């Protein structure tokens, strides 16, 4: 299970924080050991009494060191005996100076080396006229004054945040949840109870030091310097608290009221009432019902309770959940409005990602969920965990659309993080689906209306070894309609799920996308000013489309290659989905070598297991069958497992694009020059890029092909007569092991090229001006289904209309086809050139079969 980490500290962007200096020195030195000066007796006695109840998690994880010789004063958010003792223990644990030993010459004028920004209120709330205390810290004012008097003094302030019971242990009981950390400043007794119940889950966050001397050197008046330093520290503590436990959440009712009170919703209500001829009050109630149907009902106690439950569930059905690259995200995220945009493979994605974020000390986002999941009991629990529900289709319902947009705008303006799946639904094939830009558009418009905090899109790849929905996906891919979700089916399936093992899950954080950077590139005319609600700049749609594709590309660039992915790549390349054990080991070894020696990106992760361990693991989770034979064991996948395995091959198909291209070129050709191989690859690349969300430019893809060639030559898969562009590359003529492995690598892209040739063949056969894009899609699907029946069995996505639609759209973008006034597709001789290029890749028999089965459009009978 993921390790429980507390959040890394955000980097302050203020002038004072950025002026941290660790290169200078001071005449004063601070002892780093407690042996020379002992802590007060009361602190030692109380510390010993409290020690059994405390278990500290220190951030940053590595030992904190401030060893440049300058004195340290710790800054707490508020005073309190428990906080003081916890800080003292944390300093002893990290071998830092004790906060209970005063500095030389005592610049704080206190018998200690820490201060707090605010004191827990001890005023009597029953006395209405009692005034609060001072608005600034006397200790901080004394420290600044000491620096003005003594030029040699240079103290470092180290902000320290303390959170007790942010994630109570499962063993600590449900009562502990009531006393876990929140936004309220609590009294001494409640704080003591929190320590007794949740002290073993205490997080102590040390921040980088702030130089008081450099702050004074800015030359501000004394009062302004004090106010500015306090503001910087308050901002820091607020950001850390938001990162750990989330923003101070408003109630669901307040959020709904705010949505209904916006100008846009009021205008939409009036317009809808006028169109329908109804009273304003009736239409207002309709809008209110929409808002209540959408809104989340975020509840920290329910979230903490769900953590207890799902920890047991994940431990039961999964062999671990691995999280990669989350630390770099935690360094970047503070100060941003974060939008999590994960891949969508399973209903488990919702709960799994929330669980991982919570375990990593990150506040849960508000999650967009389909209204189909708003089931009795389940829907309520999901709302309590931050889900808000939207309808699958909102086209034509202007009032609902505006209510939803305003709800999202309220979340963005309130600083809540969001999570949504831009594919619109779960992928049934294992590929990333073409993105839908609706939620991105709402997020972008909300930001442009109130550009307060920068927005950060965080792509996330979720990889499984076995799918809980595997059986239902098989039914849907075979043509059965999707079954409607129901609470009874859910409860009926729970025992079945809990009895099975689903392998390991990997969650990879991709490279984040800063919205401001995208706007600077695509909308340089926007200068950060707020836009009106109805204002839609010309660049808005293109920016949304760019963001959507960029997110999908970054998700693919953070893929994880697990044992099942590697097995699928190897076994599905053979006609009977079977290999001898030695051949399978060799093929897996080659795939891993390609991934490790030619890395796709620095965020792709590859299983560390050996091929032998991979095979054993697949047998353990009942994916692989071993057939014993005197000449050597054969390993195979049968029946439904073979179809499901294509899902896991498609997860990582993009990682082998360049190597599969090179291998395809030698499947039906024994000899080819480097320059021809690269030229054809660059010509084919736009279509592969559109389908697989590849990150390279055409020149970068050409370089990648060159690197693949060099690797294949080193491995003996290809023979090279020289290193010049015109020098031929050849493969062996006989059926050697090298030829077998080369053919296996080529298989992953073979079906894509077959689909491309089917499309071009049907266009050419029917002639220009005959078929519309939708008619062409339908004919392509029919031809692909027939080819699958006649030529060889293929994966169900081979005749997926969406893949043909994407290829046709790319043909239009490249102006290889274009519509006439009747929306029929026209083309010229360039399409014939593309058809000739396909002869290099596809065999003569296959090309002939495709040309023969390519259907013609039904023509009207002559009158």
UniProtKB/Swiss-Prot annotation:
Residue ranges of the motif HXXXXD motif: 343-348
Chain intervals with Polar residues compositional bias: 12-29
Q: Name one GO cellular component term.
A: plasma membrane
EC annotation?
2.3.1.15
Q: Name one GO molecular function term.
A: glycerol-3-phosphate O-acyltransferase activity
Locations listed in the record: Cell inner membrane
Recorded catalytic activity of this chain's protein: sn-glycerol 3-phosphate + an acyl-CoA = a 1-acyl-sn-glycero-3-phosphate + CoA
HAMAP family per UniProt = Glyc3P_acyltrans
Q: What's the entry's take on its domains?
A: The HXXXXD motif is essential for acyltransferase activity and may constitute the binding site for the phosphate moiety of the glycerol-3-phosphate.
Stated name of the protein: Glycerol-3-phosphate acyltransferase
Organism whose genome encodes this protein: Xylella fastidiosa (strain M12)
Q: What is the lineage of its organism?
A: Bacteria, Pseudomonadati, Pseudomonadota, Gammaproteobacteria, Lysobacterales
